[in-house]
Amino acid sequence: MWIKELELKHYRNYDHLLASFSSGLNVFIGNNAQGKTNFLEAIYFLSLTRSHRTRADKELIHFDHSTVSLTGKIQRISGTVDLEINLSDKGRVTKINALKQAKLSDYIGTMMVVLFAPEDLQLVKGAPSLRRKFIDIDLGQIKPVYLSELSHYNHVLKQRNSYLKSAQQIDAAFLAVLDEQLAGYGARVMEHRIDFINALEKEANTHHQAISNGLESLSLSYQSSVVFDKKTNIYQQFLHQLEKNHQKDFFRKNTSVGPHRDNLAFYINGMNANFASQGQHRSLILSLKMAEVSLMKALTGDNPILLLDDVMSELDNTRQTKLLETVIKENVQTFITTTSLDHLSQLPEGIRIFHVTKGTVQVDSDIH
């Protein structure tokens, strides 16, 4: 898939913008604080209805307006789709082909994106919540049912934690009802995650071995707070551990086990990647991003859109070449932001260049 056209009204420093793109490489050049990242963020937001930079929708609204509108024309294998998001103080409205979408899971996945931003380099050593978010964003685009089950899980988890905080003593019968619901949704969330990580590991290892010239292997491990012996037993063992932890959870006023506490670990040649070099971290993250692209194509039949936000300068020529070879070979529409073309020595022909200045975007040329 690829985005043919994007229109922004009152988005951050863009008062009004209408732009059309190449189905291949699109490069946005400009000084810092001109709007390059805002532009990629808008594409990301149109896809996922959320920003990767802020949780506050009001920060997305142009300073002298009260509403935001984003519309995009997406070319999928199945045909052209129009997406629209409108934000105001009354909330947000999402539309597909002018039809309002009641559920988030009905909207997300229509336009898939993979973002590679400087903060992704913290994925290995950062908090476990970053790695859970990484899994949730990818899985939510690939499997809409996952988003629905995760939403149900979080709703029951909130109920359970609220009860634990407010109860003077445990009502075992009431807690048992919540436990059954939580274990049911949670087991399905974990099953989806485990399948995803297993598939992602195969793709990521292939890319990592190519980047390292066969010197390194990459493996991933889903680390669950729920102890289980096999995937088919997750529900029963999760439920058992919830019941076993009633007193501990009551004392701590929160739920101690479940997918909300799970983690993801990375290993290079069998060693924890927390102890890897900075160069190995860059190769690992690059391998993951290329694996995301490959896996989305394999599981959905359509390519995602790749957003590279100021990361090419973080990669040496070898890693740049591997990345661009992949997106060109797989025919992936790619958006690159940069302050200069000087370090992009490996750019191929047939790219479209845009200049970004103070919230305006001008097409330079198509290079053939």
From Swiss-Prot:
GO biological process, one term: DNA replication
Main location: cytoplasm
GO molecular function terms attached to this record: ATP binding; single-stranded DNA binding
Superkingdom of source: Bacteria
InterPro entries reported in the protein's UniProt record: DNA-binding_RecF, DNA-binding_RecF_CS, P-loop_NTPase, RecF/RecN/SMC_N, RecF_2
PROSITE patterns recorded: RECF_1 (PS00617), RECF_2 (PS00618)
Annotated CDD domains: ABC_RecF
UniProt keywords, alphabetically: ATP-binding, Cytoplasm, DNA damage, DNA repair, DNA replication, DNA-binding, Nucleotide-binding, SOS response
Annotated localization: Cytoplasm
Signal peptide start and end residues: none
Keyword presence, Metal-binding: no
GO cellular component, one term: cytoplasm
DNA damage listed as a keyword: yes
Binding site for ATP: G30, N31, N32, A33, Q34, G35, K36, T37
Transmembrane segments: none
NCBIfam families: recf
Role according to the record: The RecF protein is involved in DNA metabolism; it is required for DNA replication and normal SOS inducibility. RecF binds preferentially to single-stranded, linear DNA. It also seems to bind ATP.
Protein name: DNA replication and repair protein RecF
